[in-house]
Regions:
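Active-site acidic Asp-centered loop
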Residues: 46, 71, 129
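Structural detector for internal amphipathic alpha-helices that build alpha-solenoid repeat scaffolds
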Residues: 1-8, 16, 23-35, 42, ...
Length: 236
């Protein structure tokens, strides 16, 4: 009967099978009833993770998803975080911070994408994560969701400028250009990042030549070479 539910809709049968002792049967029944939002809390309380994961995958209730993000089983936690990200749920800072404490970088990278939306202290914590998966997730979410310089971009630039280096590629609006120059002129920044930011202006005809002339005298060889190359290309 359980396998039959995969092929036909039979909610009455599925409801009765939810009470079975066999977790495989309950899992099939839960999958069959996945669209019934009123049953998600029941699935979430099931003793077996294969039933709880159905709630994690299908619920858009932020409180239920928040509780499932702290589930004892990693696959349920991952699914809950994935659902929260997919449905752009506005979760509390406390819930997101708990997610960032996970030992699993794949989970932390999902939480980090939500942190971009929320900003503030949670985003600051996510940006301090040294795992490349987490950093890539932040960069990708920024690329897709953030179209202009705002307080989140300024915050990330101060903590993890490498991420903003990627975001600034192909962005030449006034705010982006101002941020790029501020980072180039910040001598406490990594020379490689500063030189890459200069290279981003190659081919542009709106480069501030006065600022470029000053940067050409920089103490960093990398920055000086990048500035000289840009200056030469402008003169061609």
């Amino acid at each position: 009967a359980a396998e039959l539910l995969q092929r036909i809709e039979a909610p009455e049968i599925a409801m009765s099978l939810l009470e079975e002792d066999d977790y495989i049967t309950r899992g099939f029944a839960a999958q069959s009833l996945a669209k019934h939002e009123n049953l998600h809390p029941k699935f979430a309380e099931d003793e077996h993770h294969s039933v709880r994961i159905v709630a994690a995958e299908n619920s858009i209730d932020k409180d239920l998803i928040s509780s499932l993000m702290e589930d004892k089983h990693s696959s349920v936690r991952r699914m809950a975080i994935s659902s929260a990200a997919k449905n752009k749920l506005k979760l509390s800072s406390k819930t997101l911070e708990a997610g960032l404490l996970s030992s699993d970088p794949a989970l932390r990278s999902l939480v980090a994408s939500l942190a971009v939306t929320s900003g503030g202290d949670v985003l600051e914590k996510a940006c301090k994560d040294i795992n490349p998966k987490v950093r890539k997730s932040i960069a990708e979410t920024l690329r897709l969701e953030v179209t202009e310089v705002d307080e989140r971009i300024d915050l990330i630039a101060s903590i993890n400028p490498e991420i903003i280096l990627r975001w600034l590629r192909s962005r030449y609006d006034p705010k982006s250009s101002a941020l790029r120059w501020n980072m180039i002129e910040n001598t406490s920044l990594n020379s490689r990042i500063r030189s890459k930011l200069i290279e981003q202006m190659d081919g542009r005809n709106d480069v501030d030549r006065q600022r470029l002339a000053i940067i050409s005298e920089d103490s960093s060889i990398l920055v000086k070479i990048a500035a000289d190359n840009l200056s030469s290309s402008l003169d061609e």
